[in-house]
Amino acid sequence: DAGFPGAILRAIGLRGETVDAGHGPEVRVTVAAGEPWDAWVSTCVDRGWAGLECLAGIPGLVGATPIQNVGAYGQEVAETIRAVRVLDRDRGAIITLDARDCRFGYRDSVFRRNPEGFVVLAVTFALRPGGAPTVRYAELAVALEAGPGPDGADDRDPAQRPSLAQVRQTVRRLRRRKSMLLDDPADENRRSVGSFFTNPVVTPEVAADVEARARALGLVAPRGAAIVPQFPAPDGRVKLAAGWLIEHAGFARGQRHGAVGLSSRHALALVHLGGGTTAALLELARAIRQAVLLRFGVGLDPEPVLLGTTWPRP
């Protein structure tokens, strides 16, 4: 609301790509940071390059994707990024970081942990010409009537598998249902930054405690298969569904708090309804976090980068 002591640089002048096909089954493409992301995904699909098709419909530019390791519907850019060219502000030099140096994690990277250290200039992706699409996310698989696998494999006859274009179109359709596309000005739910909170990644012990709390509150069945939604995460940890936690901590889809509120289609999206302020949005976000923390003992962290403000830690 009051601004912040800094400058925002837009990478709109950084455009273009360089294709290197000399990597066996892969094609490596270095894409300038200012290329629009969704258009680039569409280009890859049109060329038959697999690896990014599930990331369709995400707004922004290519240079933003490695910063928080953008992911959706079973894919993350870390799976295909091989290098990132950056301006190292501390050294005053342009350098190239390989994927290991980027230290990618769930919605995380060295760029996010050190936001003042680097300016992303270009990203190199390794894609699979003629490759099959990745269908490992259950919601996407159901929409495609495909059988998901943890590695995205599809055992059906190749002629029966969905194409890259079908996967991209289905992802966009799913995103539209959740108001996660920006092309409908009449949809007030689209005025958000996408998912405001990341899904908390916790130890199995914490996950068990969350489930015990939910059972004690009568939110899930005392026995049986009905449990708090959770998914395997690296290092033996567990990823909990933040949207479920929010909705079971007293916040409903479509709930309004003055000029801001929760999307009526997606509990993780906090929306601006017109005439609001950053302060009002963050007040709502902090109230949601506190309610989840008190009820389930788990803290939620914001997915967007916050400028000129702070966020409470667990």
Segments (PLM) and residue ranges:
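Anion-binding (especially nucleotide phosphate/pyrophosphate-binding) glycine-rich loop
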Residues: 1-91, 95
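Phosphate/pyrophosphate- and phosphate-bearing ligand-binding catalytic cores of soluble enzymes
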Residues: 94-279, 295-314
